[in-house]
Amino acid sequence: MTKKYNIAVIGATGNVGRETLNILAERNFPVNKIYAIASDNSIGREISYGEKILKISSLTNLNFDDIDIAFFCAGSEVSKEFVPKATASSCVVIDKSSLFRVDNQVPLIVPEVNLSTLTEFNTKNIIANPNCIVIPLAVALKPLDNEIKIKRVVISTYQSVSGAGKAGMDELYDQTKSKYVFGENDPKKFPKQITFNLFPHIGDLNKDGYTSEEAKIAFELNKIMGNHFKASVTSVRVPVFIGHSISVNIEFNDKMDANIAEEILQDADGIVTISNNNDLAYISPVEVVGEDAVYVSRIRNDVSKPNAINLWITCDNLRKGAALNSVQIAEELINNYL
């Protein structure tokens, strides 16, 4: 008989929390009891879990002794307060905030890339889920790096508003509607107007001119892939509801070209490649909504530098960029560790 587990999803009413519930149901995760947890103003509300309906309950009343795996999807402040309470019991935490990603005692996992480091989870009973840009980046870069070591990468990200939560999606919707009706926009969640606009500003601006998002991406990518190459990052918020895209230039230490890269990526887990065989041979964000794969297109040589290529990477940031990755981690936990 298959063992079943008690699961808690903290932040269940948010974008990532809802998607986590959806994916747990879709993938038939062996659940005994599942708890949908959210803020006090959501208590008693109903939320879907596959064909079932769950009632939202309170985090303060949750007994972590009854929970095997807790998915924290509610941001760093909630994680800071409640993850220690969870790990004081036998509960394993998969945290989707940035809080524990820099902790050397907490594994930062992308299953297709560095699953072997999951053995370190029981040091603190915490596993960190990476940034929603870092996950597809690592999935695409790792098979190439396995073949020929990467020397450096230059990354430009085009990040949808859902990466900023429900409030980000609401602001894009409200601003778009207001622009037509009233001809005005009042930014609240974002630093500038997001409708019909984009801006290279995600997170706080550091003294070196990079934003905190750009610094996170560079740090996390190197932690996951082994700290042997440099990454320069520019992060751009774009008026797209769901789906992150990445333009990346990769320089290698030895011979690499677009044809070799495409062959490598075609054989890699979790990737769908699109060949340059017509004018529409690329994937846009709207086409990946609801998809689990990381899509790689526009694979081409860098004509300005030998042993360098360019890629266009796109994925659903709420699925593989967040919820799916965490559920894949949980699947590995129950298959080999719990």
UniProtKB/Swiss-Prot annotation:
It catalyses: L-aspartate 4-semialdehyde + phosphate + NADP(+) = 4-phospho-L-aspartate + NADPH + H(+). InterPro entries: Asp_semialdehyde_DH, Asp_semialdehyde_DH_beta, NAD(P)-bd_dom_sf, Semialdehyde_DH_NAD-bd, Semialdhyde_DH_dimer_dom. Pathway: Amino-acid biosynthesis; L-lysine biosynthesis via DAP pathway; (S)-tetrahydrodipicolinate from L-aspartate: step 2/4; Amino-acid biosynthesis; L-methionine biosynthesis via de novo pathway; L-homoserine from L-aspartate: step 2/3; Amino-acid biosynthesis; L-threonine biosynthesis; L-threonine from L-aspartate: step 2/5. Signal peptide: none annotated. One of its GO terms (biological process) is 'de novo' L-methionine biosynthetic process. Coiled coil: none annotated. Disulfide bonds: none annotated. The active site is at C132, H244. Keywords: Amino-acid biosynthesis, Diaminopimelate biosynthesis, Lysine biosynthesis, Methionine biosynthesis, NADP, Oxidoreductase, Threonine biosynthesis. NADP(+) binds at T13, G14, N15, V16, N41, S42, S162, G163, P187, N317. Substrate binds at Q159, R237. Its EC number is 1.2.1.11. One of its GO terms (molecular function) is aspartate-semialdehyde dehydrogenase activity. Phosphate binds at R101, K216. The keyword NADP applies. Belongs to the aspartate-semialdehyde dehydrogenase family. NCBIfam families: asd_B (TIGR01296), PRK14874.1 (NF011456). Catalyzes the NADPH-dependent formation of L-aspartate-semialdehyde (L-ASA) by the reductive dephosphorylation of L-aspartyl-4-phosphate. Homodimer. This is Aspartate-semialdehyde dehydrogenase. The lineage of its organism: Bacteria, Pseudomonadati, Pseudomonadota, Alphaproteobacteria, Rickettsiales.
